[in-house]
Amino acid sequence: MKMPKNNVYTVSRLNGEVRQLLEGELGKVWLEAEISNFSAPSSGHWYLTLKDNYAQIRAAMFKGRNRAVTFRPANGQQVLVKGAISVYEPRGDYQLIIDSMLPAGDGLLAQQYEALKMKLAAEGLFAADTKRPLPSNIQRIGVVTSATGAAIRDVLHVLKRRDPSIEVIIYPSQVQGEHADKSLCHAIMQANDRMEVDVLLLTRGGGSLEDLWCFNSEALAHTIYNSALPVVSAVGHEVDTTISDYVADLRAPTPSAAAELLSQDALSKADKLRMTMTRLKQGWQHYGLKQAQRFSQLHHRLERQDPKRRLQQYEQRFDELQLRLGAALTGKLHQMERRQQSLHARLNQVSPSHQLALAASRLTHQNQRLHSAMQARLNSAEKSLQYAAHQLETVSPLATLSRGYSITLDTEGKVLHSAQDVRTGARLTTKLVDGEVQSTVI
């Protein structure tokens, strides 16, 4: 087989091209999944596995991104994440690099949104019979939005093209941030105080759920509901729906679409309006898709040249080695502890204290045996002594005396056995059972 000269890949080159292919084709994706194997090492990065019932994928969220997460992820938790597919080239593993993370389903913001929506609906703020019709001849449009945002530019561009005679008055307001809802309320009330326009357009461009959150304010909902001027809400993209959309008299999917609706009387026929709306929607979608693809390509080209990505890969590798080292050290410590316990047990078997304890036990046993033997000997000796005493008692002279006999002794204490052994005048001693009698031979 002939070896190709120009088509032989190295592993590094292959992994690099796979990474470029995945990142270039997929771009940013939204993913709903369950968290498992969650790890948060000292570097501050997060590593986890995202899974469903049939598959799983590794994921990483670096500390520059996870600082914005408002909750602590946990194993078993359902989340909604946005990120880009990437390849960790040293291992050839593909993974998801997470940019943002939200609780899925019953997340905090989603819960607040649904609770407020139900409350306002119960109060009647969404009722169809409270919606006011738009004026038939709109001459002035008041726009409540950021004076420098993309939304006002889109609105002015559409109105200029469709009906240049319509006058636009801008009521500048914050459309994002902590106090944006108060700013929006103030702008709407200012327009109602002046009463210089025919209709109000409340609008801003697209953004995340957090970016659009000021349009979900209860105070803003009541301000729109109490407005004497009709209000059109056009917040975000077509897929975004805010509380202001429900309360307003009319909802438009985008700022440009709202401008189209408000200038509809300048068109002579409804058919032309429908055709224009269709073309506008298609053109906007095509333009948005094209711009998104172009931005994604430029973004990935920039990321490939960015040393920050390489640094993140090295940090990820360092975290992995740190975890492996920690596991190895833990295993070694457990092995040493088991070895120490074994040596301690063996040392106890040969230690002097152990040997002394054994000797003391044996000595106690021997003492008990000796005491038993001595007691047995004493008992035996006592019985022998009693027997001998009995025998002596049987042959004792005292026993003879107790039967009525006596013993006669001469002056030298010798027992007299015959009368011929004494002479006249001799002194004799006669022993009786209860005493002695002195006598003289006549």
Curated annotation (Swiss-Prot):
InterPro entries: Exonuc_VII_L, Exonuc_VII_lsu_C, OB-fold_nuc-bd_dom
Main location: cytoplasm
Catalytic activity: Exonucleolytic cleavage in either 5'- to 3'- or 3'- to 5'-direction to yield nucleoside 5'-phosphates
Top-level taxon: Bacteria
CC per GO annotation: cytoplasm; exodeoxyribonuclease VII complex
Pfam families membership: Exonuc_VII_L (PF02601), tRNA_anti_2 (PF13742)
Gene Ontology biological process terms, A to Z: DNA catabolic process
Compartments, as annotated in UniProt: Cytoplasm
Keywords: Cytoplasm, Exonuclease, Hydrolase, Nuclease
GO molecular function, one term: exodeoxyribonuclease VII activity
Record CDD domains: ExoVII_LU_OBF
Functional summary from the UniProt entry: Bidirectionally degrades single-stranded DNA into large acid-insoluble oligonucleotides, which are then degraded further into small acid-soluble oligonucleotides.
Family of this protein: Belongs to the XseA family.
Assembly and binders: Heterooligomer composed of large and small subunits.
Protein name, entry field: Exodeoxyribonuclease 7 large subunit
Organism: Shewanella loihica (strain ATCC BAA-1088 / PV-4)
The encoding gene: xseA
